[in-house]
Amino acid sequence: MKLIRISQALRSLKKLSDEIRYADCFGEKQFTSGLIAFRPTKKSNPKQINHADKDVVCHVIKGSGRLRIDGKRFPLRPGTICHIPKGTPHDFAAGKSEDLILFFSLIKTH
């Protein structure tokens, strides 16, 4: 068993790019969970990510932004939870004024 405070995980975010920071919180054979933070940018990276063998579940912790799937944009705000099936290309972007912070789980599916 492991307990993590979100405030503690936020302090341990590591830079992935100018736009993205992340922190792994939990990891097992079938799943990984953590925090990911997107900074506001004038133009977000249009590259989409695809997890071929993992479903994604995200919970918006702080900030606002959007999720893009198949050219459709879905607004994200604190309290929003989303499920992205494996193999679905997607990307996230923060709104204009503050970071978009998500708690995510990548769940290996067969």
Language-model-derived ranges and their functions:
Residues 86-110:
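Ligand-binding loop in jelly-roll beta-barrel domains
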Residues 49-51, 83, 90:
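Histidine-centered active-site/metal-ligand motif
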Residues 28, 52-53, 60, 85, ...:
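A short, compositionally biased micro-patch
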Residues 27-29, 68-72:
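Short strand-coil-strand connectors
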Residues 57, 64-66, 73, 89, ...:
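Structural motif
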Residues 38, 50-67:
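Short, conserved beta-strand element in jelly-roll/cupin
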Residues 14-48:
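A short glycine-rich, His/Asp/Glu-containing loop-to-beta-strand
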Residues 71-86:
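Short acidic-glycine-tyrosine-enriched beta hairpin
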